[in-house]
Curated annotation (Swiss-Prot):
HAMAP family: lon_bact (MF_01973)
Family membership: Belongs to the peptidase S16 family.
Reported function: ATP-dependent serine protease that mediates the selective degradation of mutant and abnormal proteins as well as certain short-lived regulatory proteins. Required for cellular homeostasis and for survival from DNA damage and developmental changes induced by stress. Degrades polypeptides processively to yield small peptide fragments that are 5 to 10 amino acids long. Binds to DNA in a double-stranded, site-specific manner.
Cytoplasm recorded as keyword: yes
Subunit and partners: Homohexamer. Organized in a ring with a central cavity.
EC category: hydrolase
Binding site for ATP: G370, P371, P372, G373, V374, G375, K376, T377
Primary location class: cytoplasm
Protein name in the entry: Lon protease 1
Induction remarks: By heat shock.
GO molecular function, one term: ATP-dependent peptidase activity
Stretches assigned to the Lon proteolytic domain: 606-787
Gene: lon1
Naturally occurring in which organism (per UniProt): Herpetosiphon aurantiacus (strain ATCC 23779 / DSM 785 / 114-95)
GO CC, alphabetical: cytoplasm
Length: 815
């Protein structure tokens, strides 16, 4: 203990000086650079009175808070006395502090112009029973220090001698802690430990770890030196060879090109396998005349290898709050979709932070499924933006050759890498977000099945060693984030679908289309057509006209085209010098867009018996269909037309059988088939149709036809029928309901068990549409058909004999 330490008494109240990036240990001399105005004021006041100050480490070791608050520094530190002080010309101070003892803050009693606090002294503890262990730890620290010293260039000999000769365990602990490589948090932990034995134990661990790091570093350095010696030898020999050739006049462009490729190969950061392959091909290139056909093939191959981003990657730190802002800014609505995406991103970020040994990409692969124009591709772009990654789109529509994914072997003329490797090359990084667009449009032929190649690409257990046929070296795809899009799941093979996490995107409501148009489409189209906001304005009613009268789609792609047409017309007026702003009202909108394209057909098409409005699902969204039934003089034949599939034909047969069995209860003559043929037609005959969901609509159409009762013009229905008249649940409820709402239908009949699906319907649609859940087709008839008949029901003479044309085999005519 020094003379200063023996004679200095630490008062109960002292000033507090926060330290940035270091911790003050007792029984040491600590140099300080003091530049903060409040700290300079503190030191000046100290020199005028008591020279003792409390040194407390700031918790943030990288940046000093401004202002410094009590919670910004540790409450346990050390008391020190100013030993030496020097003022510099720039006004800052250099001080040498004699650190005395550990102290702890009891209470802050002053905050301005600097902190003062009540403190209590916290002396270190050393039990007699721990003396042997402490002695052993001191010797261990000395041994480790002796091993570390030769591994660190210019290691101070005086420091090693001090460590080896120090007999005071407390002084040794603080001496070693002062020079050891530790973070502020670890340094503070050493200071906070009351037991000297525990301090020495922790320092023993720190020194052992540092020794291991230094030894491994020395081994690596030795290996690098050996490699450098070999490389330098080759370099010297090549330089000598070039000099000899230059003297002989044999220097040519080929050598220059080969040397350039060699330098680029070394700088590319390739994997060991790729580097070995590249050098092998480069040696072949050296020996090959430039006129050889294979020369350009090898050169192209090497340039492709060099251009790949072997070591370049984006910093993909995910901020979930920022991701939320990006998704909300780029897309209106889609709340459930956004929630699922944010959950996915949060899991990736937690896995990256808490389980770095696990590949963060080994999670689910998102697949957005929905109609065209609902934002699948733009969602993928927003995810890349939220993750700070490069985005690249890979269109798979119409791909039917496996080589388009895996690449062509170099034995073929014009061989190229597969589209996946080319996409990564275009992105410039090895961890882009790759959007596999239209994955449901993959097909196969005699050249292979690209779906099989996609299985390897999307499987985390296999894609770490993806081997493109052209490259013929392994490429790690695990850093790549894949997102797929599709219009339907029906054409995606089951093994591929199992690797995807499906997120369904439904149709937009009228309100959502209006919001998307006003927030995104109108400003974007205005900018694309070089129009200023004060030159063209579209009012509320005009947008509704464009949506309701000129588009009928699940997404907004066609709506964007119509808005683009309006902007082109407005741009023409501006170019002609018309007064601005040009206000697009409903009248101008209709003038610019031409004749109306879509009308509400419900009342017009359901004003006679035998016509029913049904609901269908298609890969491009929901739609309404009109099922038409008619009768004619005949002998009981039953015809179907409209390109109906087998399932839909069976639904029609089931509907007819139920009508024949139960029709008398609804006033239908049981012998109607003696003099009449029936024909059920589903318009839009060029479009194939199938599925069981039109069963109740067909039964209702037949009952309407045979009873003369007309369907209510605001009703549509969907549901499967059984021979007993039971109504079974169906799928695609959301798309069908939105299609009905777009068409102006305000009453929808659904199977009872499908009412649970209404929670997927937007609230504004639910408020405008009345839903009826049914379990039997009889309920459908009572809800859908008007009570009075507009035509006389079908009747036949009582003496007529019923032919058996409906008895067993029904003749189905498909026109």
């Amino acid at each position: 203990m020094s003379e200063v330490e023996r004679t200095t008494t630490i008062p109960d109240e002292i000033a507090i000086l926060p330290l940035l990036g270091t911790v003050a240990y007792p029984q040491t001399i600590m140099p300080l650079a003091i530049g903060q105005p409040e700290s300079i004021r503190l030191i000046d006041d100290l020199m005028a009175g008591q020279r003792i100050v409390g040194l407390m480490a700031l918790k943030n070791e990288d940046e000093r808070p401004n202002p410094v608050l009590p919670e910004d520094f540790y409450q346990l530190g050390s008391a020190a006395v100013v030993h030496k002080l020097m003022k510099l010309p720039d006004g800052t101070l250099r001080a040498a502090m004699q650190v005395l003892e550990r102290i702890e803050i009891v209470e802050i009693i002053q905050t301005e112009p600097y902190y003062r606090a009540k403190i209590r002294v916290m002396p270190d503890a050393l039990a007699e029973s721990e003396q042997l262990e402490v002695t052993a730890l001191m010797r261990s620290i000395g041994t480790i220090a002796s091993q570390i010293a030769p591994l660190i260039p210019q290691f101070p000999t005086e420091l090693l001698n001090s460590v080896l000769s120090e007999e005071d365990p407390r002084r040794l602990a603080y001496l070693v802690a002062s020079y050891a490589r530790m973070s502020v948090t670890d340094r503070q932990a050493v200071l906070a430990e009351p037991s000297i034995k525990q301090k020495l134990l922790k320092l023993n661990e720190v020194l052992t770890r540092e020794l291991n790091v230094l030894q491994i570093g020395q081994q690596i350095q030795s290996q690098v030196q050996d490699e450098m010696s070999k490389t330098q030898r080759e370099y010297v020999l090549r330089e000598q060879l070039k000099a000899i050739r230059k003297e002989l006049g044999e220097n040519n462009e080929q050598e220059v090109e080969v040397d350039r490729l060699a330098e680029q190969i070394e700088a590319a950061g390739m994997s060991a396998e790729a580097h070995q392959q590249a050098m092998r091909e480069l040696d072949r290139l050296r020996q090959m005349p430039t006129a050889a056909a294979e020369y350009s093939v090898i050169r192209g191959y090497l340039e492709t290898l060099i251009a790949l981003p072997w070591q370049k990657r984006s910093d993909d730190t995910i901020d979930v709050a920022q991701a939320t802002e990006v998704l909300d800014a780029d897309h209106y609505g889609l709340d459930e979709i956004k929630e699922r995406i944010l959950d996915y991103l949060a899991v990736r970020e937690l896995r990256r932070k808490r389980s770095p040994e696990r590949d963060p990409g080994r999670g689910a692969i998102l697949c957005f499924v929905g109609p065209p124009g609902v934002g699948k591709t733009s969602l993928g772009r927003s995810i890349a933006k939220a993750m700070n990654r490069e985005f690249v789109r890979l269109s798979l529509g119409g791909v039917h050759d496996e080589a388009e994914i895996r690449g062509h072997r170099r034995t073929y003329i014009g061989a190229m890498p597969g589209s996946l490797i080319q996409a990564i090359r275009r992105s410039g990084v090895n961890n882009p977000v790759v959007l596999l667009d239209e994955i449901d449009k993959l097909s196969s032929d005699h050249r292979g099945d690209p779906t099989s190649a996609m299985l390897e690409v999307l499987d985390p257990a296999q894609n770490t060693n993806f081997r493109d046929h052209y490259l013929d070296v392994a490429w790690d795809l695990s850093p790549v984030m894949f997102i797929a899009t599709a219009n339907t799941l029906q054409t995606i093979p089951a093994p591929l679908r199992d690797r995807l996490e499906i997120i369904q995107l439904g149709s937009y409501t009228m309100r959502e289309k209006y919001e998307i148009a006003s927030r995104y489409l109108v400003p974007e189209q205005r900018e694309q057509h070089s129009l200023a906001p004060n030159e063209v304005e579209i009012d509320h009613e005009a947008l509704l006209v464009a949506i309701e009268e000129y588009t009928r789609e699940a997404g907004v792609r066609n709506l964007e085209q119509q808005i683009g047409t309006l902007m082109r017309k407005a741009a023409r007026q501006v170019a002609l010098g018309s007064a601005t702003p040009i206000v697009l009202d409903p009248a101008k909108t209709r003038e610019y867009l031409g004749k109306r394209r879509y009308f509400s057909e419900i009342h017009e098409r359901t004003d006679r018996p035998g016509i029913v409005t049904g609901l269908v699902w298609t890969p491009v969204g929901g739609d309404i269909i009109f099922i038409e039934a008619t009768k004619m003089t005949g002998r009981g034949n039953f015809a179907l037309s409209g390109q109906l599939g087998d399932v839909m034909k069976e639904s029609a047969r089931a509907a007819l059988s139920w009508v024949r069995a139960e029709g008398e209860a609804y006033g239908i003559d049981p012998n109607f088939a003696q003099h009449y043929d029936l024909h059920v037609h589903v318009p839009a005959g060029a479009q194939p149709k199938d599925g069981p969901s039109a069963g109740i609509a067909m039964a209702t159409a037949l009952v309407s036809l045979l009873t003369g009762r007309v369907l209510r013009d605001d009703v549509a229905m969907t549901g499967e029928i059984t021979l007993r008249g039971k109504v079974l649940p169906i799928g695609g409820v959301r798309e069908k309901v939105l299609a009905a709402h777009r068409a102006g239908i305000r009453t929808i009949i659904l199977p009872q068990r499908n009412l649970a699906d209404l929670d997927e319907i937007p609230a504004d649609v639910l408020a405008e549409v009345q839903f009826h859940g049914v379990e039997h087709v009889g309920q459908v008839i009572e809800l859908a058909l008007r009570a009075e008949a507009s035509e006389a029901p079908v009747s036949v003479p009582e003496s007529a004999v019923m032919p058996n044309l409906f008895q067993s085999d029904v003749e189905v005519l498909v026109h």
